[in-house]
Structure formats: structure tokens, C-alpha cells
Amino acid sequence: MSENERGTQLTEEEKEELQRGEKGAIIELLVPLENYLSAGVHIGTHTCTRYMERFIYRVRPEGLYVLDVRKIDERLRVAAKFLSRFQPQSILAVASRPYAFTPVQKFAEVVGARAVVGRMVPGMLTNPYLEDFIEPEVLLVSDPRTDTQAIKEAADMGIPVVAFSDTDAKVDYVDLVIPSNNKGRKSLALLYWALARQILRERKEIAPDADIPVKVEEFEVKLSQ
């Protein structure tokens, strides 16, 4: 077990707490708590911006910020409801961080959205004379710290932005934050999988308790052998 993993281990009491709402009642998460934890969606960084403080569950003795899984789950639901209101092809999902490439591409495939991974061509959202010009109605980004070009252009065009945001995120021009570990391979896979499934549920394309035929593992970037 790495030092980072030891720093994010939760006690049984903490796990019990994370399965209860503000009034102490058991809450139903989109994904079983253990699945969230094993994927590391709650693992933050050693830095926390003022806006992201509201999503923090604990600060470990070594200074590592740990996100509240309940708030991650809640924002996934809110984001899914919001994104489900748009026509699939009007949703643009982008990722400049390599670990997000496969999750974004699979997400787009499942929900019918567009995907742009890697370097985004400047002017893609703002220059109608550009060959790659597109006009999305909403933008989903994997990391506000690395997807800055997309966020800036969306802001210039009045396009709402939904962003997976770690504890160190600067969320200027982001309209809806999904607190999350947006740097981990398994975390990104689970987050995009859960969001895709919930969007289909919100659209009533699948039953409220149904799964999608694509497994979480298929959303995960495969490490080179």
C-alpha cells in the first residue's frame, strides 16, 4: 500500500457516516460506497481552493484533502439531470489529460455526445471560419486546470460549463462543479461511467435502476504493457 493510499483509508466509523445524510438517514448512492472508495474518487490533493472547501470531508494529518463522497454523488446526479436536457450531439466533452481520453470517448459513445481529446484547436468554439468549428450548447470538461482553452472559448460564447474538479481547481467560468479526483485512471473511469448511466436514466432511455451494457472497465485507460 502506497503512502497516498494509506493517507486516504477511511475508518469503519467514517464509512458509516458517509452512508448517511444530514439527518442521519441511510442514503442511496449511485454507486456503492466501496466502489467509490476503491476507485479513489475521494482522493484530493495537498492544495484546496476556497471554492472547493465546501466539498471537503477530511484533511489528513499530512495535509491531504479528502472529498466527501456524498457530495460527489449529489453533484453527479445534478449534472446528469442538467445534461439530460440537451440534445445528445449538442454536448461536447473534452479532455487534455491522457487518463481522461478513454473515459471521455466512451462517455460520448454511450450518451451520443461529441468528444475532443488531446490538444484543442484554438478557435474551435469561437471561429466559424475554422474547419473544425463546432457549436455545442454545453461543455463538459475533465479538469479546469488543463482544459482552460475550452473553458475560455465556452465563456466567450456563453456556453455553460460542467467540470470535474479536484480540490486544487480554479473554477472561474465553470457553471457546475462535480468535485472529484480527476487525475486518477480508475477514478475518471468510474465517474464518467456513473455520469453516462445517470444521464440515460434521466432521459428515460433505461429504467431508474438499470445499468448500461458497457462496463466500468471499458471506460478505463489501459496502461501500456
Swiss-Prot record:
Entry keyword Ribosomal protein: yes
Pfam families hit by this protein: Ribosomal_S2
A biological process term (GO) from this entry: translation
Keywords: Ribonucleoprotein, Ribosomal protein
InterPro entries: Ribosomal_uS2, Ribosomal_uS2_arc, Ribosomal_uS2_CS, Ribosomal_uS2_euk/arc, Ribosomal_uS2_flav_dom_sf
SUPFAM superfamilies the record matches: Ribosomal protein S2
Stated name of the protein: Small ribosomal subunit protein uS2
Biological source species: Metallosphaera sedula (strain ATCC 51363 / DSM 5348 / JCM 9185 / NBRC 15509 / TH2)
